[in-house]
């Protein structure tokens, strides 16, 4: 019984669409985050003096601090974007798959 349900889910066009869209979207977001993180690490490795330069002569806050915070903020934003799309389009496709499989 369960084997046939799993097979019907795998054969469902909406399920294949869901898997493809979710994988593509997650890959794009992962590549963006990886590029941001590697860029930050490369700055640390090859331009530590530039990162260590104060933003203002009257402060001890360096360029590296807001850039590091920016990396963290970007990760939160990308996570929020994924959640927003997952709760909308991906959940809709998931529900379509469930209704079609249960109806057949």
Curated annotation (Swiss-Prot):
- Entry keyword set: Cell inner membrane, Cell membrane, Membrane, Transmembrane, Transmembrane helix
Its subcellular locations are: Cell inner membrane
Q: Which domain of life is it from?
A: Bacteria
Q: Which residues cross the membrane?
A: 25-47, 62-84
Q: Read off the InterPro entries from this record.
A: DUF485 (IPR007436), Inner_membrane_assoc (IPR052959)
**Membrane topology reported for the UniProt record:** Multi-pass membrane protein
* Database matches in Pfam families: DUF485 (PF04341)
Q: Which residues lie on this side of the membrane: Periplasmic?
A: 48-61
Q: Say where the protein is mainly found.
A: membrane
Write out the GO cellular component annotations.
plasma membrane
Residues exposed to the Cytoplasmic side: 1-24, 85-104
Name of this protein: Inner membrane protein YjcH
Q: Which organism is it from?
A: Escherichia coli (strain K12)
Please state the gene responsible for encoding this protein. Answer: yjcH
